[in-house]
């Protein structure tokens, strides 16, 4: 699973996932087809991996997949049946915070029908709304 190799600080505050993805990471840059977020939310490292495996299994040997997001935010929680107080819990997993317009995955080397179906299978593993996009001429 994806997670940072090392961080300056182990724990991070919750923060608010606001705004939209303006220019960076919003276009199909590497492949021919892309899966773009139209909702907002958090995607865990496990969900990123589950979607990648679904796509990889569907396209079999053909094509290439790029993952355009990385889970770099630690989420901590306290163990079950532990009283409140006594500090913040330990980091349990990592998430990628996603704003609308962010490109999640890209694919190349397959025909459009196969890419659409692979992205449909991947989107079922993700907790936010997505759309299929094709690279525009001149990009």
Swiss-Prot record:
Similarity comment: family membership: Belongs to the universal ribosomal protein uL16 family.
Main function: Binds 23S rRNA and is also seen to make contacts with the A and possibly P site tRNAs.
Q: Which PROSITE patterns match?
A: RIBOSOMAL_L16_1 (PS00586)
Return the InterPro entries for the record.
Ribosomal_uL16, Ribosomal_uL16_bact-type, Ribosomal_uL16_CS, Ribosomal_uL16_dom, Ribosomal_uL16_sf
Please state what the protein is called: Large ribosomal subunit protein uL16
Mind listing the UniProt keywords for this protein, alphabetically? Answer: Ribonucleoprotein, Ribosomal protein, RNA-binding, rRNA-binding, tRNA-binding
GO molecular function annotation: rRNA binding; structural constituent of ribosome; tRNA binding
**Mind naming one GO cellular-component term on file for this protein?**
cytosolic large ribosomal subunit
- Region (Disordered): which ranges? 1-23
Q: Enumerate the Gene Ontology biological process terms.
A: translation
From what superkingdom does this record's organism come? Bacteria
Record's subunit section: Part of the 50S ribosomal subunit.
Residue ranges annotated as compositionally biased, kind Basic residues, are 1-13
């Amino acid at each position: 699973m994806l997670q940072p190799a090392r961080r300056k600080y182990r724990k991070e505050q919750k923060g608010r996932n606001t705004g939209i993805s303006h220019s960076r990471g919003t276009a199909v840059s590497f492949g021919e087809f892309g899966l773009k977020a139209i909702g907002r939310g958090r995607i865990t490292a496990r969900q990123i991996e589950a979607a990648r495996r679904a796509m990889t299994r569907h396209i079999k040997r053909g094509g290439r997949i790029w993952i355009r997001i990385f889970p770099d935010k630690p989420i901590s929680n306290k163990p079950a049946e532990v009283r409140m107080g006594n500090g913040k819990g330990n980091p349990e997993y990592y998430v990628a915070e996603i704003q609308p317009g962010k490109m999640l995955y890209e694919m190349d080397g397959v025909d459009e029908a196969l890419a659409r179906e692979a992205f449909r299978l991947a989107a079922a593993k993700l907790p936010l709304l997505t759309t299929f996009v094709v690279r525009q001429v001149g990009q």
